[in-house]
């Protein structure tokens, strides 16, 4: 079967650095404007309170921006808003080992949580995928079998590195259920879809998790 799995980015633990999504969340808590100018010079409308659906939509926009540009933009935004991050709330390797002792499996979510579609250098791709697996093995004694693509973004090149690195399951964000044919197919496990739960409307989430929402979208928008 597919294990209950907590997917981590080892670099964030090694460097005690919060993920950029946590920095963004802290910034939005302090932000009082009605729109944000993003690094690509587009404007994103903000309404308070910022719910999870809006937050994920904003993350989706920012994830398509070059990693260095996004980091610089967030650093400037956090400085302008005088945001102070609670670094004590970040997980440590001791916490990860405790998770394993309590029945969790640990998977990789890449080394630094960058957009793998933007990675051109083979060495960087190896670090994000293969070295990430090695770091988890070094710290826990268990080589992870699961790789969760950051934001579900992947291509043939990154998928081949995942398979070569020894992972047997790769998680996407296609927002559709995985049927039994996929689960029973070893190749299908390397492109396993998932459904993101936003906790905004429980009725909609029931439809999405059942697969009905996905099939209705395919009927109304076959492209």
Which sequence ranges carry the predicted segments?
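Short beta-alpha junction loops
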Residues: 8-13
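N-terminal-biased segments
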Residues: 51-53, 110-116
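Short, basic/glycine-rich phosphate-binding loops at helix/coil junctions
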Residues: 73-76, 106-112
């Amino acid at each position: 079967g597919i294990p209950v799995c907590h997917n981590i980015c080892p670099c964030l633990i090694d460097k005690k650095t919060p993920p950029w999504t946590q920095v963004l969340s802290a910034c939005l808590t302090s932000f009082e404007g009605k729109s944000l100018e993003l690094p690509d010079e587009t404007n994103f409308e903000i309404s308070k309170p910022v719910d999870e659906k809006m937050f994920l939509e904003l993350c989706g926009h920012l994830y398509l921006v070059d990693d260095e540009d996004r980091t610089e933009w967030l650093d400037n935004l956090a400085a302008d808003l005088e945001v102070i991050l609670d670094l004590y709330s970040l997980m440590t390797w001791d916490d990860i080992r405790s998770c394993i002792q309590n029945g969790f499996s640990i998977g990789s979510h890449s080394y630094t949580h960058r957009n793998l579609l933007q990675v051109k250098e083979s060495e960087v791709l190896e670090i994000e995928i293969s070295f990430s697996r090695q770091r988890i093995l070094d710290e826990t004694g268990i080589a992870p079998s699961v790789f969760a693509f950051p934001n579900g973004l992947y291509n043939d090149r990154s998928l081949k590195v995942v398979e070569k690195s020894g992972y047997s399951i790769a998680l996407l964000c296609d927002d559709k259920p995985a049927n039994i044919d996929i689960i029973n197919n070893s190749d299908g496990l390397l492109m396993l879809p998932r459904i993101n739960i936003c906790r905004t409307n429980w009725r909609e989430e029931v439809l999405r998790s059942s697969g009905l929402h996905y099939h209705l979208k395919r009927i109304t928008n076959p492209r």
